[in-house]
């Protein structure tokens, strides 16, 4: 487990970091699954997946279900009309 700081500046542990992903590029394949609920995230961690992708709206419950897996928050782009809307949504997801 790697020690990191969350976007809220709180200490946490993660199985992977961005640096790990960059270092493994071309050398290792990772597994990733979509999870949008506490139960799905918990199941993903217990099943041994490396990473989770989630709708940005569901990050809080997904993080409750999986405290340790690398999490990607995805924006649903058809919900944003302009580039400014996309940036606002991206910062809100952080």
Please annotate each region the language model reported.
Residues 2-5, 11, 38-94:
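Active-site beta->alpha loop and helix N-cap motifs at the rims of alpha/beta catalytic domains
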Residues 1-33:
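N-terminal amphipathic alpha-helix/helix-capping segment at the start of soluble metabolic enzymes
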């Amino acid at each position: 487990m790697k020690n990191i700081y969350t976007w809220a500046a709180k200490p946490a542990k993660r199985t992977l970091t961005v640096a790990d992903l960059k270092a493994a590029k071309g050398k290792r394949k990772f597994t990733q699954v979509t999870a949008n609920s506490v139960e799905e995230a918990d199941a993903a961690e217990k099943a041994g997946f490396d990473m989770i992708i989630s709708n940005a709206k569901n990050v809080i419950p997904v993080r409750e279900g999986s405290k340790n897996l690398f999490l990607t928050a995805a924006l649903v782009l058809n919900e944003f009309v302009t580039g400014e809307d996309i940036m606002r949504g991206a910062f809100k997801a952080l």
